[in-house]
A protein has these predicted regions:
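Hydrophobic alpha-helical connector segments
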Residues: 61, 75-112, 166-173, 213-218
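Hydrophobic/aromatic residues within well-ordered alpha-helical segments
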Residues: 55, 62, 66, 70, ...
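Amphipathic alpha-helical segments used for helix-helix packing
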Residues: 104-134, 182
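Residues at secondary-structure transition points
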Residues: 3, 7, 11, 53, ...
Length: 218
């Protein structure tokens, strides 16, 4: 009975998170209340509070859940025989990220999360400081770590210059991905998403390589 109760609790928690994501993306974080979230699920506001002590706690849980989901999607794109990002090269990681971008734009929850993060939260507000810091420093998100490790691998193998900062390159690469995916979701990108990502990563790769002639990142 206890196990059944735990499953029901987790199921309800996930329903609340899904409802919150939909409403946050459509109405905005500030304009959405616990009453709105509860009404959409035919629940009481108190029931929502039982799972999340505040709207901020709910948002943090939602961000964590979505980052974990994106991380699982990236892990599923690992080359056959690989179980981690540790031994991957930059071109391989770049290819994984391009394919993941194609997955994201076809995923309703993924697109809703992007709209929420980019358009429906006032990050400058003081109340958002803790969440903003957690999101910006959350290196659990697989792509950042994958790009960093790939650059470090390149430096060790001699294919990447020794003066290159792996963390800096990782930040640039994730920012490219984030910006182009959001532009595609917002219908403002006037070129092919996958082709543009590949060419962008190819440019980054060429800028950090030690040799003059190297295979493109594809």
């Amino acid at each position: 009975m206890a196990r059944k109760g735990q499953k029901e609790t987790e199921k309800t928690r996930r329903r609340i998170l899904a409802s919150a994501l939909t409403l946050f993306a459509k109405k905005g974080y500030d304009r959405t209340t616990f009453t709105d979230i509860a009404a959409r699920l035919d629940m009481t506001k108190g029931a929502v509070y039982w799972h999340f002590e505040s709207k901020q706690a709910l948002l943090m849980a939602l961000i964590d859940e979505m980052l974990q989901k994106f991380g699982r999607q990236i892990a599923a794109l690992l080359p056959q025989g690989e179980t981690s990002f540790d031994g991957l090269s930059f071109p391989v990681v770049a290819d994984m990220m391009v394919r993941n971008a194609a997955q994201i734009i076809c995923d309703a929850k993924g697109t809703a999360f992007f709209l929420l993060i980019h358009e429906q939260i006032k990050w400058a507000d003081a109340s958002m400081a803790k969440i903003r810091e957690d999101l910006l420093t959350n290196h659990r998100f697989g792509p950042w770590s994958a790009f960093r490790k790939a650059v470090e691998n390149g430096i060790r193998s001699g294919s990447v210059r020794t003066d290159v900062d792996p963390a800096q390159v990782a930040t640039v690469c994730v920012s490219i991905w984030d910006g182009l995916v959001h532009s595609r979701i917002a219908h403002v990108l006037q070129c092919d998403l996958e082709d543009t990502l590949r060419k962008s990563y190819d440019a980054v790769w060429k800028s950090i390589t030690a040799a003059e002639r190297v295979p493109p990142a594809q």
